[in-house]
Each structure stands twice: as C-alpha cells, then as structure tokens.
Curated annotation (Swiss-Prot):
Primary gene name: rpsB
GO molecular function: structural constituent of ribosome
Protein name: Small ribosomal subunit protein uS2
Pfam families the record matches: Ribosomal_S2
Species for this entry: Methylobacillus flagellatus (strain ATCC 51484 / DSM 6875 / VKM B-1610 / KT)
Domain of life: Bacteria
UniProt family annotation: Belongs to the universal ribosomal protein uS2 family.
Length: 249
C-alpha cells in the first residue's frame, strides 16, 4: 500500500502541538506555525513513512516479528485491530516496565494466563468454589488486558512500531537497551532520539493514527506474501529442474 500526500492532509497528519510545547529537536520536520500550532512538513513525512514501510516489508519477508505499541485512548482500539489483522503482537493497554528487558518474567505471566484460560475453557474452574473461580476470572481479565496481545509473541520482537514515543518512552528506552529498532510516530512536542525510523506527524488524531497503523499492517502482510510467493516460486523452479534432468536421462 502506498500513502499519498492528500491522504495525509485529510487525516490531519500535518497538525503538530501548540508551539509553546515544541521540542527543538523536531525543528527539521516543521514547516511553520499557524494559530500557535506547529505545522509538520509533509514533504519530509511522506518519504520517511515510505522508508519505514519499505523496512517493515523487508523485515516481514524475512520472517521478522514486529510489535505494535499504542496505549493512549485514541490509539488502543486501532492498534489492536491493525495488529490482529496483520497477525502481529501488540500492547494497547499499559506498557509494563521490563516488558522487553525482563521478558523471562513476562513469559511466566503468559504461561499463567494460558493455563488459567485453559481452565476456564475446559470447565476445570468449576471444581473451585464460587469465590475462588471469580478470582481466577478476574486474574485472566487483568492478564489479558496487560499481556494478552503478546501471548503468541514467543520471543523478543525484531522491531517495534510506536504511536507517540513520548507517551511510550518506557518502550523506547527498553528497545534502545536491547538494540531493537523503533519505528515511531513523533509529534512536535517529542524527541526523535532513539527512533530508527522517524515518522514526523500528529499522534493525537484517530484518523492519523489509523493511517500509520494501517500502512504498517499492510506492509507486514505484503512482506509476508512476498516471502510466500518466493518460496512457491523456488519450489516450482526446483521441480522444473528435476523434470528437465529426468527428460535428459
């Protein structure tokens, strides 16, 4: 999927924050100001977003794992929906400290969640008293909200896509410690430091958030399809060679 300048304008990607909240490190991406609001230069944003999409396509074609992160109210549902559509892990409620740097402990919580879910599904919960059964159900809800989106992740991601790097500063810091590249939407009030693929843009508008998340999800699917097509092509070429060899004999 390719995104156009018009689509970005319609989604309000160019609207930054109030000028008094600006981060000077975002100066290269700012076009100017209007009514005390910074206007982001979409001539900078569009090629940078395309670079990010190209990277995601390549990573996905090589079977890389991309974690979607967006826990602010406007992003939660969109992040979950687009990540699920692309078959990617996601965090959309709250970033728990150590989610990456202490993944061993997180894996234990995931194990507990899957065990409790199995108990609920096969009716094993019924052997407990009402109060205890309710406790299990509440624990499942709590775990599902915080780590449900990463229970199939299996290991650390190869890259992280983040909406609002300021709001998700914990995720950016942990990714930097582990050398995991960050693809981040950076508004005019935040710093692009520590972000490998900067997408300068509005991080508050749900339309803009949808545009970024849909683009990344599409790139994941395109990369995966490219990988499958290459495998099929390679397999058919091998068969063709074998047929030729048999014919030669």
């Amino acid at each position: 999927m390719s995104v156009t300048m018009r689509q970005m304008l319609e989604a309000g990607v160019h609207f930054g924050h109030q000028t008094r909240y600006w981060n000077p490190k975002m100066a290269p991406y700012i076009f100017g100001e209007r009514n005390k609001i910074h206007i982001i230069n979409l001539e900078k944003t569009l090629p940078l977003f395309e670079d990010a999409l190209k990277y995601v396509r390549q990573l996905s074609a090589n079977k890389g794992r991309i974690l979607f992160v967006g826990t602010k109210r406007q992003a939660r549902d969109i992040i979950k929906e687009e990540a699920q559509r692309a078959g990617c892990p996601y965090v959309n409620h709250r970033w728990l400290g150590g989610m990456l740097t202490n993944f061993k402990t997180v894996k234990q919580s995931i194990k507990r969640l899957t065990e409790y879910e199995a108990l609920l599904q096969d009716g094993g919960i019924e052997k407990f008293g009402k109060k205890e059964a309710l406790g299990y159900k509440r624990e499942v809800e709590k775990l599902e909200r915080s780590i449900g989106g990463i229970k199939e992740m299996g290991g650390l991601p190869d890259a992280i896509f983040i909406i609002d790097v300021g709001h998700e500063s914990g995720a950016v810091t942990e990714a930097a410690k582990l050398g995991i590249p960050v693809i981040g939407v950076v508004d005019t009030n935040n710093s692009p430091e520590g972000v490998a693929y900067v997408i300068p843009g509005n991080d508050d508008s749900s339309r803009a958030i949808r545009l970024y998340a849909r683009g990344i999800a599409d790139a994941v699917l395109e990369g995966r399809n490219q990988s499958i097509n290459e495998i099929v092509k390679a397999a058919s070429e091998e068969e063709f060679v074998e047929v030729e060899e048999v014919a030669a004999e």
